[in-house]
């Protein structure tokens, strides 16, 4: 935020909020996110979400981390309070028009990618090692499948289902099984 010269950072993409705060939810079927908005300044983090979306221990952890929870829809009134001398960093591609239109016209908007984009994409050493192991395991499984297929084609009946079953068996083997 400081490098960009911003006073406030508005984050609206649900996966980025979940990643940044390390929270999961069930507001959207089959997607572990919480319907929310986040506004960060140099001194505070405001999370706009339904309090019922969180268990007590999560609320306590957020509070301990300095995150203040506000009602989900109150974001629209809050952004109206942005001062004209403030610079607001947000990604217009990921912000709804109602939110942008509620920001005072004399507030300077810095339209840039979310600050979470690069850190989210950066793998730590454990993630890199686990990815390497997964690639090796998958490569061995595919090699075994191709060998099995070449060896057995024409010798035994092979259907799509039996081929998929074989690949699933190989894919679930651990490296020590291989």
Where are these regions (language model features)?
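A composition/biophysics-driven feature that prefers long, compositionally simple stretches
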Residues: 1-166
């Amino acid at each position: 935020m400081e490098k960009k010269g911003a006073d406030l950072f508005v984050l609206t993409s649900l996966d980025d909020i979940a990643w940044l705060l390390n929270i999961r939810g069930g507001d959207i079927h089959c997607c572990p996110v919480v319907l929310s908005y986040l506004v960060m300044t140099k001194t505070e983090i405001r999370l706009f979400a339904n309090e019922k979306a969180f268990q007590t221990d999560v609320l306590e952890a957020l509070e301990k981390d300095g995150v203040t929870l506000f009602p989900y829809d109150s974001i629209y009134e809050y952004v109206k309070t942005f001062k004209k001398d403030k610079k607001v960093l947000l990604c217009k591609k990921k912000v709804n028009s109602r939110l942008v239109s509620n920001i005072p016209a004399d507030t300077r908007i810095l339209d840039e990618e979310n600050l979470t984009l690069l850190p989210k994409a950066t793998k730590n050493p454990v993630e890199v090692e686990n990815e390497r192991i997964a690639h090796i395991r998958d490569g061995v499984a595919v090699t075994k499948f191709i060998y099995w297929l070449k060896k057995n084609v024409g010798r035994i009946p092979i259907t799509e289902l039996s081929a998929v079953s074989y690949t699933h068996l190989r894919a679930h083997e651990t490296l020590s099984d291989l």
